[in-house]
Amino acid sequence: MRSVFLAGVALVSALAAQPATAAPDLDLRDNYAHRRCHGGENAGEGLTVGVPGQEAKAIAASQGRVKRSGKVLTLGKVRLKTRMVDGDGDGGEEFEYLGGWARSGLEVVFVLRYEDLAWRLIDPRSGQSIEMGGPPLASPSGKAIAAVGDDSLINEFNGIEIVDYKDGRFESQAIDADYACDPVWLSDEVLQLKVLSPKYRDRNGELLAGELPPSAWRTTKVVRKNGEWTLVAPKP
């Protein structure tokens, strides 16, 4: 009996010594599924926000890093208090915690305002934050975060935005791109995506009449050169 008891104690001790399972890194790639390059008419339908119970699951997976008490969302040094969005100019903001990236220690909160929305990147250790106009996607190391837009959301975000997180600071760079879609990180230095072919605009920059087929988009890349992000010109 003693040997069996000791074996049981050893097993319990071994299980207790195992580290807690880390929460999976936030992955918002499916938020781009309803964009113009896929023939989508309402990009908002593809956003994974406002789903009942979703935030509670994300907070539970944070293993104590993030907490909510009523209208107050706490992420380390950062406290966000919801003010219901009732109308234009009321200053209302609603916050929903989505998850984070263990690789960089950054957290992501969705922000809803009157006729506006954003994704806020937060460093809960320093309290610093920055907002992006589209669903953020982290590079393999988690130190570069990209978002692209095709002017299909209420914030009218159109183009590419890349945020570098270095030495505890956020550095943002905006890149002109027409109806950007389908971002995929190939490495920490290369972001693949699709942009609208220039032949679908006239000399004045206006869109040609008619619907845009999925074939109107061209696959290209954004690459980092000498510390700057540059869009490789797409083929016509």
Model-assigned labels for residue ranges:
Residues 174-182:
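Conserved blade-ending motifs and adjacent loop-strand segments that build the rim/top face
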Residues 12-19:
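N-terminal signal peptide c-region/cleavage motif recognized by signal peptidases
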Residues 109-114, 147-154, 158-159, 193-199:
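Beta-strand C-termini and the immediately following turn/loop, strongest in propeller blades
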Residues 58, 67, 98-105, 135-147, ...:
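Blade-terminus and WD-like Trp-Asp/Gly-His loop motifs, strongest in beta-propeller folds
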Residues 21-112:
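Terminal domain-start segments
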Residues 1-8:
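Bacterial N-terminal signal peptides that target proteins for export
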Residues 119-157:
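Mid-length scaffold segments of soluble, non-membrane domains
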Residues 69-88, 114-131, 158-173, 205-233:
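Surface-exposed loop/turn elements that mediate protein-protein interactions on large endomembrane-trafficking
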